[in-house]
Amino acid sequence: MNTGMKILPLFVAAAVCALGGFSSQAGQAAERTVSPRTYYGKIGMRLASMLPRFHVLQQGLDDTVSQRAWTNLVTFYDFDHSVFLKSDLERLAAREKKLDDEVKAGNVSFGYDVYNLYVARLRERIFFATNLLARAQWDFEADEVYRIKRKDAPWPETRAEAEEHWRRRMKNEVLAQMLSRELDMEEKSRKAAARPASEKTETASEDGGAEPSPAKKSDTPEESLIKKYRQYVTVMTEPDEETVLQHYLGAIARAYDPHTDYMSPASKEDFDMEMNLTLCGVGAVLSMDDGALKIVEVMPGGPMAVDGRIKKGDKIVGVRQGDGEMEDVMWQPMKKSIQKIRGRKGTRVTLEVLPRSDPTGATRKQIELVRDEIKLEDQAATGRVERVELGGVTRKLGYVYLPGFYGTMDKKMSDPGFRSCALDVSRYLADFNSVGAEGLVLDLRGNGGGSLREAVMLSALFVAGGPVVQIRDVRTVGSLPIPPGNPIAFRKPVVVLTDRASASASEIVAGHLQDTGRAIVLGDRRTHGKGTVQSVMGMGPDKYGSTKITTARFYRINGRSTQVEGVGADIHLPSLLDSLDIGEDKLPNALPFSRILPADYSPSWNLGRYVDELSALSAARLKDDARYRKHIENVEGMRAISERTDVPLSREARKRMMAADRNLRELDDIDEEGADGDDDEAPARRPRNRRAKDDVVLDEAFRILSDLIRMTGGQEVPQPKGWWL
């Protein structure tokens, strides 16, 4: 069973701020309506039969599910409530509680009715917007704002109200592009002025005094936006019958929970590509999000991870091959976009990226990568021994960074090519024991999960026996135990580092070590909160596609689910992710937190009793740590950006805001530089990749571990009798 946090690359959610493309001429093109093929009704009936039977909720396809499906479909097309009119929704609402009955009867026409109406309204909106862009008449002195978060905004009641929204939207996008270019030039000038005179002379000498070649004329913001909206409408008005069916049946499936979905035959190919870790030549797992390719996971060892500038949660909106032109990939089918990103080993590709920290979409980075194979050794666990001084005492401490729960499922340990993260970690633990390491930091930050078997085996390195996790499906509750006679590989104190990106198998391990009193959890307030298992099931003939259904839930051995709640930190050391609007609880129709009876287990230690004292010592220490105070300022600044609901449309106010935001986003690209490097108790800088210059959270984790070792007085977990065979 695989518990990796995989996000199915399915849909293109409509109408994202600052992105798209259309021309006024295209708006006058003849409209084409789409209708279902004759056998699509049978697919709908099959889905209506499977969801109540196999989904963990065991909920019938009823009026409640119908209402959720209605909302899913309407908001899939009109994500920011800017295309449909209120009267359109009132007309569609007549069938809001009837979709369950229609699909059971083999009627899937509602999905096509919504799509065709959406296309008609979209043409009207973009025709207006592109005419406005062509006139290029803006008043950037007026005291206006643009609402950037519109998921809860009311739909416009009239066409005039809709056009007022689109006027502000175009003004916002033009202003954002204009000021972004202006700030780029100012930054370039500052850097040039700051260079030593010798460098400037050397550069001039290399130029040989020749006249610079004329630069290629850039598009104006208006020209750039017209091109984007042209592509937006082209893509959104070209879906075939199968794609529209996928959108509709997917909306019905996701009414049960966000990880349940319908996959057309073409979409199933994308899913298989993701599950087989087809990494697009740059080392990333991708999904569709508001029309862009969202970075779900940066794979260790890949070009993207080695470069370090692209983060999980960033969005790819453009691709350039070698020295060619940048091609917009917004709203394109995922398969087409991936084909552009992939390529021969050693070739160059430039990605245009929207940083995760900018909800306005105004900031774009162009990052060149060289395509390469993913090096398996770079995906593996890494470890080292750190010498940490605290209070005049220097200790040897072990550190293991585990990027994912990898493991070979179809080979024996003696077979060539066998891989196991638990086995790799055990080798590091043996090394730590041999050099006398007194404790361990297990770093699960950014670990999205993987093999459940490996999660159990990893826990077995620290705990002698008992259940690791409970699993509840539609029929039974069971648990996965550590095999009897298991020898503990590491018996000394452990702290586990987690963040909001730690999910699934990571949450199982962190929760188990916390529940058994074997480790103290540090990091973001809580982890991601994905506590469910999905199964992919065929629906009959290949042309019917497949469905991905949530069939079980995970529970900690204390009886609490990891769903939504995740694993809470014993000591809160926030990362920048802690300030962003991410996590299972942010997904529509997420299954709620629940609990069952605790498993039969005994604590292996009681490290939790030291949490209050450790937390007080850490707080006192960090209060006087200038580096950490700066880190917290950045976290709070990022939180303010992510919670922003509107932006000014006056030039001066917007420029001040964008300049301040830039300073914070630069700190999301690389960790903060040390501010008090003369502190002789601060652990040495330890880069986790080529670009990471500092990790204040990891530094404090080592200090907390050092305090914990002092408090336990050298105590270790007793070694059980017997051997794990």
Predicted feature descriptions by range:
Residues L61-Q67, V74-R150, V233-M288, R348-T350, ...:
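Extended, small/polar residue-biased N-terminal targeting/export presequences
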Residues M1-F11:
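Bacterial N-terminal signal peptides that target proteins for export
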Residues S502-S504, G545-T562:
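Metal-dependent DNA phosphodiester-chemistry modules and their immediately adjacent helices/loops
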Residues E182-P196, A204-E206, S218-K227, R560-K721, ...:
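Conserved functional hotspot residues or short segments at active or partner-binding sites
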Residues Y40-A48, D62-V74, H81, L89, ...:
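Extracytoplasmic/secreted envelope proteins and their assembly/folding machinery
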Residues P9-G21:
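Bacterial N-terminal signal peptides
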Residues T75-F76, K97, G111, N116, ...:
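PDZ/PDZ-like domain segments forming the peptide/carboxylate-binding groove
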Residues G27-E31, S35-P36, S49-D62, T234-T243, ...:
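Cleft-lining beta-strand/loop regions that shape enzyme active-site pockets
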